[in-house]
């Protein structure tokens, strides 16, 4: 069964529509005109759409909570949303472009206490990959939140970062203490989410069953990343499997492996469908296109498929022609 005209229009021109929830964020419902208003932070924050990390990428972290302990103002607690989970690993945290960890490797999930970092000896932090059901909020944050944060702040399904800063005046040199101001640029280097690989899951059961999604070498493969985004009903376009030419994705996945092409980047849900798909296509220097009502992919050095016009797909081709002019 092919795509409906309304779905085709969404693929090529609509603004992205998906809702997300992160820690203390409240989701705003998307409207029928396919606009996404992101998520609203309940307290001391701003609107930030959740980011979807694919492959190995550096992700800007959105601060969702900030508090100075009322009884000991040396302590500053902050919570950050990294992006949609579950991510494969969190490899490094950067504070104002300075690395927190002494190596850039998959870091231990959990709490990292003071003196862990040579660059930030006064900063403790907690890492979560965004499991479907996460562990309770770190006690160190709860104890310095003046009763505002509870154990229920788990951040289910959200990769997150918790910071606890003990601020003191440096006596050992200018570089001893780098983190005092509560406003800092925080970024996370992550290996992103699991993907649908049509070579091992030709029926794309991973669309609705995330346990069928894989990492391995697939999580950086452009074909697998694109297919996951097209099919995922939560953060992606939510297409049905029958709307996609799976064979073309299998061919592209093998082509990308052979050419060592990778997709390493995050999807920003403030972007339009068209902008997101263009970025995906740029990663393998190819095309994402519609043919006979199906979404297909191809690298540009592969001979283009012929399009046979008939009454069934005439309107589809007219829509694409108008958008390409």
Which stretches of residues belong to each language-model region?
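Acidic, small/polar-enriched beta strand-loop surface segments
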Residues: 85-89, 309-325
């Amino acid at each position: 069964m092919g795509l409906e005209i309304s779905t085709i229009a969404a693929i090529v021109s609509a603004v992205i529509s998906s809702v997300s929830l992160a820690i203390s964020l409240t989701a705003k419902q998307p409207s029928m005109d396919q606009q996404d208003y992101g998520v609203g932070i309940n307290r001391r924050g701003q609107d930030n759409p959740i980011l979807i990390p694919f492959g190995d990428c550096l992700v800007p972290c959105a601060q969702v909570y900030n508090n100075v302990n009322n009884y000991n103002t040396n302590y500053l607690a902050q919570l950050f949303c990294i992006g949609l989970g579950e991510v494969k690993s969190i490899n490094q945290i950067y504070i104002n472009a300075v690395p927190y960890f002494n190596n850039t490797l998959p870091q231990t999930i959990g709490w990292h206490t003071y003196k862990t970092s040579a660059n930030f000896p006064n900063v403790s932090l907690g890492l979560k990959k965004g499991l479907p059901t996460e562990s309770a909020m770190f006690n160190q944050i709860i104890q310095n939140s003046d009763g505002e944060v509870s154990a229920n702040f788990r951040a289910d399904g959200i990769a997150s970062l918790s910071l606890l800063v003990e601020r003191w005046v440096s006596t050992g040199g200018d570089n001893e203490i780098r983190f005092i101001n509560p406003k800092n640029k925080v970024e996370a280097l992550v290996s992103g989410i699991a993907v649908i690989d049509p070579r091992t899951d030709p029926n794309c059961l991973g669309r609705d069953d995330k346990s069928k999604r894989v990492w391995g070498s697939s999580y950086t493969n452009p074909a697998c990343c694109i297919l996951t985004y097209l099919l995922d009903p939560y953060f992606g376009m939510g297409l049905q499997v029958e709307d996609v030419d799976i064979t073309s994705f299998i061919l592209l996945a093998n082509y990308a492996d052979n050419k060592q092409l990778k997709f390493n980047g995050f999807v920003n849900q403030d972007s339009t469908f068209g902008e997101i798909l263009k970025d995906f296509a740029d990663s393998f220097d190819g095309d994402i296109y519609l043919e006979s009502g199906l979404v297909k992919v191809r690298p540009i050095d592969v001979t283009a498929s012929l399009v046979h016009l008939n009454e069934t797909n005439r309107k589809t081709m007219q829509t694409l022609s108008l958008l390409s002019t």
